[in-house]
């Protein structure tokens, strides 16, 4: 007697055929496989510390240490300032650091390399550690090529799937959007070199900063008045990606009321979600609105919170610059972390009408003034009719869409 041994699908390519709904392909992969394989978590009522909204969300870090690394005594991708149990060491001005920025000379070494060879970028150190078998990549396979049908997807057209919500796939731009997409009018502020950002893992040498809302007479945390919203995201971005691709994006009711620091920053992601999405407030907004209808928005704070591995979901967002219960740096197990300060869509209603939550370079959640300049990554929902064409979801083989 013979029995077939079921092998769960590893990627969307194994779980779905071209021409099927992208949303159903993702949920099918999650249901047919295991979260430990796919890094997709179904946030139903049985998921511990989850959102409880029946969404399917990707969570975890892109890079993980291998068995070879563990046997060598390296339990983490990054070493802490005073330890040697990580694969990669970071240095600023000749001193070993565990920071996110460096205004002086920076370099990286590999703990297992007795020659202490220096690498100029975090990306280069990662690539060598992967080649040498100490680190694996592509552990979260949620890359999508959007805005291009080229055989090799341009890096500026790479987006990532946050999850599936009410039958719609939610995307965020992988790297920060620059002037070619958002323009230099509206709430454009300045540009910054990426040289000083120790864990920046993108492809750009310069990142454009945008105000959240800098218009003199309406510089408040009211999203409907923001030119980052009305001009840079919902005019320039849509025009620059072209009609074909803009037509694949659904008009969405965004939750823009926000909440207090105590209710967003100083609580676990599940509570952040309730206070940001389910029960937002209108305190300190000027239009008394908790929703706004448009195609393009920015990430929610809770999106970022749940993008980390579940081991981090018992940590408050105010401590996402630290470690989870396993002593692993949370920013190394959160695929959404890119190493540069950036805006969320959610106002901070704690103090006045000028503050909004933002992600800091260290992976922590802070608040900033609406006339501060930070990076921006467009976020949007695809229409439920958008179809899967191919690809496994890795950076080199991103999911492609039927055009």
Question: What are the residue ranges of the model-derived segments?
Answer:
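Long, domain-scale functional regions
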Residues: 1-403
